Every structure is written in C-alpha cells, then in structure tokens.
Amino acid sequence: MKKLLLLIFIAMSAGCSREEKMLYENINEMDAEYLSTDELKAREQELKNSISEYRSILEEKIEAARDLASYHKILGKLYLDNRMFMLAAEQFDEAIKIDSENPVLFYYGALCYSRYSKSLMNQSEQYSNILIAEKYYLKTIELDSSFYKALYAVSVLYVFELDQPDRAVEYLEMLLDTQKSNYDAMFLLANAYIRLGITDQAIDIYNNIIKTSKNSVYKKQAEDNKKKLQDSGYEWN
C-alpha cells in the first residue's frame, strides 16, 4: 500500500513538474525576443520560483474565467429563449470577450442581433444591427466553415435583408456541398438565383427537389414555384 501511494505521489509530482516546465518555457519564449541571454539566465530561477508559487492561483483564475464564460453563455441562451434579444446579445458578447474563438458564441450573438433588428422602427438602427449580425455570422464561418446553421442564416440576410443574392449563392453552395439534401437551403438558393435573373438554375433546383424529396410539402412547393416561374408570375417573397 505504501509503495502504491509513493508511486501515485511520484506520478503526480512528475505531472506537475512537466506542466510547470512547459509554462516556464512558454513564458521564457515570450521574453526571449527582448531580453539578452545573460538577462534570461539571471531571471531563470526567479521565474521558476514564481511559477511554482503561483501555479495554483493561476489555475484557479483560468478556471474562474471558463466558469464566467459559461455563465454568460447560459444566461444569454435563457434570455434568447425568452425573446429578450438585446439582453441575450450582450451576454454572448461578454462570453466572446473570454472565449474569443468559439463559433457557437458568434452564431448565437448573430442570431440575437438579427432578431433584435426586426423590433426596431428606426431604419438606420435596424440596418446597423443587421450588419452586426452579418459580421458575427461570417466570423462563425471563418472559425468553422462547416457550421451549416450560420451558412444558412447569413444567406437569409443576403437574400431578404441586404439585397445581395450573389453572396447568398456563395454560402448556400458551401452548405449544399456537405448537406446535399438540405431542402430549405435549396429553396433559398433557387430564390437567390431568381433574384439574379438566373431562372434556369432555379428550375433545375426545383426539379431536383421534386425528384429527390420524400416530403410531400416540399414537392408541392417546388412544383408550385416552378409553375409560377415558368408562367412568369413568380412572387419574389
């Protein structure tokens, strides 16, 4: 039993030593650019002692920051679920300050700004919030190019809010590269093509939906849209 406890202690100590060594090397590398070799050597033991002394405090602060980010994320989602869109956006913004490369936070932040914009009467304020939503969706995609909800959502903005259907085509094609049976994206892509005057592409999409979809609602909608388009009576919205 004593041998087992000794082995556990040695293993834990070795783990701590390795982590402290890695932390020392990382910090030392930061200073190496502007300190001379003699200066680095002179402060080596001081730095190692500081790391050993403050390691537990540093770990607590890191963990506290993670907990704070989770708090803002959870509160933001609760606000969003209760349709308190600006309060939710503020919480996701706070979480982003801590967890700055998390695509989920940017996606939900974008969703909040987009939904909030619909409540505004002032067109300038509405447009400003739509642009923030666009920026956040694009950041989501930059961080995770396969985030299909963001690809679809930013395309909705480009088609219905920003009148940039050409940009919607770009992101919808990215989405459909990996989700070939995403019929909502197909309908939106057809809409974008129509707005660009590329009606033959839209008809091809409707034919594909009619041929491949097992959903009777999708089939009928595609058939109706195709007929309206062929009869030149398609309603853009």
What are these regions (language model features)?
Residues C16-I74, N237:
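N-terminal leader/linker segments that initiate helical-solenoid repeat arrays
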Residues L47-S56, N82-E94, K118-L138, L162-M174, ...:
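Structural signature of tandem alpha-helical TPR/SEL1-like repeats
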Residues A64, I98, L143, D177-Q179, ...:
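Structural marker of alpha-solenoid helical repeat scaffolds
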Residues Y71, L105, A150, A185, ...:
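TPR alpha-solenoid repeat register
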Residues I74, Y108-G109, A153, L188, ...:
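Canonical tetratricopeptide repeat
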Residues R195-N237:
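Terminal, low-structured helical/coil segments at or just beyond the last alpha-helical repeat
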